[in-house]
């Protein structure tokens, strides 16, 4: 009675581990790129705190521009997609 339950749990663990390994291999090979939305943090990610304080990437007051952009992260680097 206990053996079928243990074998099912073991099967689920193996399948989950293999799925994660395959996704990681595809990502590292460049065949699959997971996209992560970045909302409002693009200036911070690209220029750091000093860039935000000096107004880099923003208006004269140092804030972000009023232009509505979409940001995605590709291989860990933020990319701008203009709408």
From Swiss-Prot:
Each flp gene is expressed in a distinct set of neurons. One of its GO terms (biological process) is neuropeptide signaling pathway. Residues 1-24 form the signal peptide. It is found in: Secreted. The keyword Signal applies. The modification Phenylalanine amide is found at residue 47. Residues 25-36, 50-83 form a propeptide. Keywords: Amidation, Neuropeptide, Secreted, Signal. The keyword Signal applies. GO terms for cellular component: extracellular region. FMRFamides and FMRFamide-like peptides are neuropeptides. Belongs to the FARP (FMRFamide related peptide) family. This is FMRFamide-like neuropeptide 23. It comes from Caenorhabditis elegans. The gene is flp-23.
């Amino acid at each position: 009675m206990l053996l079928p339950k243990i074998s099912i749990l073991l099967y689920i663990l193996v399948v989950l581990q293999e799925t994660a390994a395959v996704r990681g291999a595809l990502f590292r090979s460049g065949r699959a790129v997971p996209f992560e939305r970045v909302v409002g943090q693009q200036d911070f990610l690209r220029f750091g705190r000093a860039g935000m304080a000096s107004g880099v990437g923003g208006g004269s007051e140092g804030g972000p521009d009023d232009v509505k952009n979409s940001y995605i992260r590709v291989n860990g680097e933020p990319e701008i997609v203009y709408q």
